[in-house]
Amino acid sequence: MNQPLKPNSFRAGPDEDGRFGIFGGRFVAETLMPLILDLQDEWNKAKNDPVFKAELEKLGAHYIGRPSPLYFAERLTAELGGAKIYFKREELNHTGSHKINNCIGQILLAKRMGKTRIIAETGAGQHGVASATVAARFGLPCVVYMGATDVERQAPNVFRMKLLGAEVKPVTAGHGTLKDAMNEALRDWVTNVDSTYYLIGTAAGPHPYPEMVRDFQAVIGQEAKEQLLAAEGRLPDLVVAAVGGGSNAIGIFHPFLDDDGVRIVGVEAGGKGLDGDEHCASITAGSPGVLHGNRTYLLQDGDGQIKEGHSISAGLDYPGIGPEHAWLNDIGRVEYVPIMDHEALEAFQTLTRLEGIIPALEPSHALAEVIKRAPKMGKDEIILMNLSGRGDKDIFTVGKILGMGQ
């Protein structure tokens, strides 16, 4: 396969059709097209509107708790004996993950568009909680679609959503996971186009969602860049984040894409291994196709039917990936690697024991890769990792596996 030509900037996309190279675009039902174009129009106005930016920054500071800290993991660094490890502490945000950054941005857009009802899809429940949270903050009704399997394994987040006033609709189709929840949300949206805003939680879906979600999440990388320059006087040698749909990863990656000396690694869910179907490594083991309104790498069979992936982490359990990640992989700017369930589980325990931080299973995948790479790097080198969510929601899953349940 011919390598695409290196662009002048890795940060210029998407083009006016929402494409990153051959990926992205907007493949939607005819009934949704006017709404998508309206959304794009509003987004183009909002992102250049100083009033919108000011409101976003104010809510970021006083509601989310930004900037999130940059934390030097001293004991983990000493234990591994190599590169210095810094965490961007997104798990300290209101609601416990990076998801709120995007939700605040999108609900402000929904208000601008005069929408009176919010729908969302969720896997781990973190995006559902963040959507229910902003809907409560702005007084809008909210319906969250969640795969029945995920409802079961993420019970604390289901309860949180209900407490916040959201209606949680379990989806039993397919394997009852994130893909199926997204399908149901899209069906709802087609039926209720006038009143409803679909608050997509990851950097996927039809244009302008991948760009919009990335821009709302890029605050992570922008802050981390400034914070690391203040702490170390230079940029990191390596940036690492877990990738499901890819919003936390693109948020920390994007501001570093044009910095030549910075290597970037996205960590996919390797599940129980890549030889079978029980994983969610769309880039490592998938092929290009169209799902949920955009062209990207997918887990699909020879007939183009979407496979049901598996990950110990509900938030990485998606058979696709954001189109910008697909492009960054093909152009060679970002390296994507799989981490298995058992490796993520070990990393989860390591961080808890050494730093007193209980991470979510999603960033535990990124951490497992950091644990592999840090000892092979020099002590003068720096790794920046996005600690995208806290592990409260996962303690029962982990407890069950480790035989530590009640």
Curated annotation (Swiss-Prot):
One GO cellular component term: cytoplasm
Pfam families: PALP (PF00291)
Modified positions (N6-(pyridoxal phosphate)lysine) in chain numbering: 99
Catalytic activity: (1S,2R)-1-C-(indol-3-yl)glycerol 3-phosphate + L-serine = D-glyceraldehyde 3-phosphate + L-tryptophan + H2O
A Gene Ontology molecular function term of the record: tryptophan synthase activity
EC identifiers of the protein: 4.2.1.20
Gene3D superfamilies from the UniProt entry: 3.40.50.1100
Keyword set, alphabetical order: Amino-acid biosynthesis, Aromatic amino acid biosynthesis, Lyase, Pyridoxal phosphate, Tryptophan biosynthesis
Signal sequence region: none
Pathway(s) annotated for this protein in UniProt: Amino-acid biosynthesis; L-tryptophan biosynthesis; L-tryptophan from chorismate: step 5/5
Cofactor(s) named in the record: pyridoxal 5'-phosphate
Top enzyme category: lyase
Top-level taxon of the source organism: Bacteria
InterPro entries for this protein: Trp_synth_b_CS, Trp_synth_beta, Trp_synth_beta/beta-like, TrpB-like_PALP, TrpB-like_PALP_sf
HAMAP family: Trp_synth_beta
Family of the protein in this entry: Belongs to the TrpB family.
Subunit structure: Tetramer of two alpha and two beta chains.
Biological role: The beta subunit is responsible for the synthesis of L-tryptophan from indole and L-serine.
Protein name as catalogued: Tryptophan synthase beta chain
Organism name: Sinorhizobium fredii (strain NBRC 101917 / NGR234)
Gene (UniProt): trpB
